[in-house]
Amino acid sequence: MRIAVLFFTIFFFMSQVLPAKGKFKEICERPNGSCRDFCLETEIHVGRCLNSRPCCLPLGHQPRIESTTPKKD
């Protein structure tokens, strides 16, 4: 009877394991990058992931660069 209870508890806890694909986000070679179907407006495309999706990096706080071209009057 002990063996039956042991097997029951083992099979019960094994059935509770969630699939890894749904819980973990695939990360591209960049530390802050993420694999998506399409990059958001606030992200840039920097390469491809292992599943051939684009690797997207957030832009963050980029300094605004003023144009050095002289203005025509």
Curated annotation (Swiss-Prot):
Signal peptide start and end residues: 1-22
Gene Ontology BP terms: defense response to bacterium; innate immune response
Alphabetical list of Pfam families matching this protein: Defensin_beta_2
Disulfide bonds: C28-C55, C35-C49, C39-C56
Entry's localization field: Secreted
Location, primary (coarse class): secreted
Keyword Secreted: yes
Segments traversing the membrane: none
Any one Gene Ontology cellular component term annotated for this protein: extracellular region
InterPro entries recorded: Beta_defensin_dom
Entry superkingdom: Eukaryota
Keywords: Antibiotic, Antimicrobial, Defensin, Disulfide bond, Secreted, Signal
Described function: Has antibacterial activity.
Family that this chain belongs to: Belongs to the beta-defensin family.
Name this protein carries in UniProt: Putative beta-defensin 108A
Source organism of this protein record: Homo sapiens
Upper taxonomic lineage: Eukaryota, Metazoa, Chordata, Craniata, Vertebrata
The encoding gene: DEFB108A
